[in-house]
Amino acid sequence: MNKNIVIKGAREHNLKNIDLTIPRDKLIVFTGLSGSGKSSLAFDTIYAEGQRRYVESLSSYARQFLGQMEKPDVDYIDGLSPAISIDQKTTSRNPRSTVGTVTEIYDYLRLLYARIGTPHCTKCGREITQQTVDQIVDRVMELDKKTRIQILAPIVKGRKGEFVKELDGIRKSGFVRVRVDGSVYDLSEEIKLEKNKKHNIDVIVDRLVINDDIKSRLTDSVETATHLADGNVVVDIVGDREELFSLNYACPEHGAVIEEMSPRMFSFNNPFCACKKCGGLGSYKEIDPNLVIPNKKLSINQGAVKASGWSVKDGAIAKMYFEGIAKEYGFSLDVPVDMIPKDGLRAILYGTGGKKLKMKRVTSYGTGDYQTDFEGVIPNLKRRYESTSSEWARGDIEAVMTTCTCPDCKGARLTPEIMSVTVGGKNIYEFCSMPISEELDFVNNLELTSRQQMIGKLVINEIRQRLSFLNSVGLDYLSLAREAATLSGGEAQRIRLATQIGSSLMGVLYILDEPSIGLHQRDNDKLLGTLKNLRDLGNTLIVVEHDEDTMRAADFIVDIGPGAGINGGELIAAGSVDDIINCERSITGMYLSGKRKIPVPEKRRNGNGKKLTVFGAQENNLKNIDVEFPLGKFIAVTGVSGSGKSSLVNEILYKYLANVLNGAKKRPGKFEKITGVDNLDKIINIDQSPIGRTPRSNPATYTGVFNDIRELYAQTPDAKQKGYKANRFSFNVKGGRCEACEGDGIVKIEMHFLADVYVPCEVCGGKRYNRETLDVKFKGKSIFDVLEMTVDEGAEFFEAQPKIYRKLKTLQDVGLGYIKIGQSATTLSGGEAQRVKLATELSKRSTGKTIYILDEPTTGLHTADVHRLTTVLDMLVNAGNTVVVIEHNLDIIKTADYIIDLGPEGGKGGGTIVKTGTPEEIADCENSYTGQYLKPLLKK
């Protein structure tokens, strides 16, 4: 078997005919600048070819269901194993997917609870057990000798009635005594019961004294009692206590029955066992009055009501109803909403409850008065939401809806009967709600009977193993109940990594995309240990990574570069860490050797003296903390994974400020108040989501520079002569675009059993525009020629056009000079998309009162890109703005003016402020994990 993977002539995307040999069964790191071609080589070439070969081995019938993979642009690859990609892009958005279901641990839990779980009565909490007559007799015979007992048949439990028929029946059956509501009666006497009172009736079947000779008689008496009372029997230990027994899986006191348990009973996707109100989701959507009227300082006439169809600007009907309510409840539509009487506001939101309003109808025929009631904005929205079949209409109403925990199941997703089943004193939801670290402790310390141990041993081992794997990749703070849709890309990737370790496969080629993302430096060693374990099983790992510790732990490093885009795509160096360091062309090597580094600022900014303060932050695991954000500074929010950073910044700070400053409709996390908002005028969240989801979106359209370019072309003599306006130069509308390809420049040809083929449009030759439009030139270049230019070329070409040049210059400033002006948004990496957004902000005129939020902006960035990012962020702060980043990257953290370090641990062990202050102050804090790793960097 070939000991190497040999690649010849790799040309996918920007790769420049790369030849490369990498060793098998090793930990290999692919590194290089963002956009250099690492992912093109790892995912789009090596993984794509491995997948394609597997799919090609299947029948044509099977291939039509799997979809075809296009052959990557490479001459030859030898030594490939079956390839598994573990990236960050495939997190399930299904609300039914949880960490437990994704890892399949929940399947094992369902099996465990079905086989050894103990059901309880939902009313009294009594343990429900299924017993035979012999087991009941054996339990009774364990009582001390000479103990006096009564065998009772509980025929009536807490029911109203006179029960004449029942009493007559047991009298005819030959029984002598009966106990009614605790008092013993002789059946020969007349027993009258109050009809409207609840009664308990027990037939006294036998009276015995415990000794060795009564077993046969006791058995007969128990059988008689269970026959009378539907399988139930009460053993009254005279002068002591009573014990209830049942032949059924039912509470002998309340009759709560549970069917024989099976794994499917514990699935919240099973309609018979899922909570009836939420259908197994654990939550439901409801209209939030705070989103219907987000700003109570506005009046109704100023448009305070933001709900679909109910703004006074939407039409006369809304205004007509609101005027009727205002007249009825005595207020003006021009006063702020928070000054409207409570009953008046309630009538607007929830209706008049049948009370008639005096309305005035105004039509073209005249005016008239009439009376009608009003159902209310919220009931109206709810009715429309439930009745409409239009996705657009539902989406419009969902803008004012919020997700709430189901009041019936409290988020547990299952019925009370299923939730009553416990193992080790915890039901399945209580177990899944604990952090993984606590779940592991619980499983390790589970006390079981010998029978339970024998039945559950294998299942418990599987659960323990999988929890250990999740723990080993730094996910100990997550819970199995956590929705998969709420996971970050890094968390989702590490979950899949843990699942793969659990499969214990050998001879597989794993390709991972930055597994260290979202991981605190403290947990990085755990991750590296996990990767090495996967390698030691006999697998090859290719890891696309920028983390220095991962590179130093690798067996082999491949450095792609030297630059990005058209300036990248070359093999710079391949070998050990020392080989990379000794390569003069390697930018990675320069940072590894320390020849280049991101400097620590000589002094920290003082800010503008103003501050933004969050009081009583309690979202998720935040422990009622007060946090100050000094304005005019670069602020880093740090802490181990799960310490509460996103809860504070994204859920509370961003959502609240977006509502107040930008008029958004978001539901912030739980907090008491936020002060200092009047010192800001805008909040902007710059994340790594795509700048567009179709090939028609590109950096030019996103930054707005394409509008300026089209305006410029419309001003050329040729365009004026032909009467062309700016829209003539858009490839999105009819007129100037090529109609054969509708402005795409390419045409799709379906090949059925082969991959679809995309070929250049024959009419326009791939140039997207028709001939007349392309004939219009500026400085000898058509509009298509401009879109094909790199940003660097465009900046030089438009140097004399200030509006265009300024926007292109900001793209250069953020290090995107290599991308094409018209490059499809779908081909940009997350880091590149984020920098396009940063450039767009830099090109705007700053008021100096903006706060920028960035969540792990270093994702996908090489150290050289991080260096450039710090420069860009400095530009934003130097303009008087405030930048808040959630970050684990120490190179970013050390350049901050102010750090808010949360922790000390993740999950329940987090949610408090460990330390705030400058990086130097954090480094001096012994309790701060961040400070411990930061200290050596500040000394360099």
Label every PLM stretch briefly.
Residues 1-940:
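Conserved phosphate-binding elements of NTP-dependent enzyme cores
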